Curated annotation (Swiss-Prot):
Pfam families according to UniProt: Ribosomal_L32p
Claim: ATP-binding is one of the keywords in the record: no
Protein name: Large ribosomal subunit protein bL32
Gene (UniProt): rpmF
Amino acid composition bias (Basic residues), ranges on this chain: 7-19
One MF term in the entry's GO annotations: structural constituent of ribosome
GO cellular component: large ribosomal subunit
Organism ancestry: Bacteria, Bacillati, Bacillota, Clostridia, Eubacteriales
PANTHER family found in the cross-reference section: 50S RIBOSOMAL PROTEIN L32, LARGE RIBOSOMAL SUBUNIT PROTEIN BL32
Signal peptide start and end residues: none
Family: Belongs to the bacterial ribosomal protein bL32 family.
Ribosomal protein keyword on record: yes
Amino acid sequence: MGVPQRRQSHARKNKRRSEWRKIDKPGLVECPQCHELKMPHRACLNCGYYKSNKVM
């Protein structure tokens, strides 16, 4: 089994650990009712429709 040959600096350690937190921005889709941008699989905040049904 491999053993570290040199001590890793704080900067390199922190840089490696920070990568897992990066999350892509969610894609936006156009609402079929009012044509505003909204998050997918959620009701439109502008008109209140979700899957062609008024929910809000």
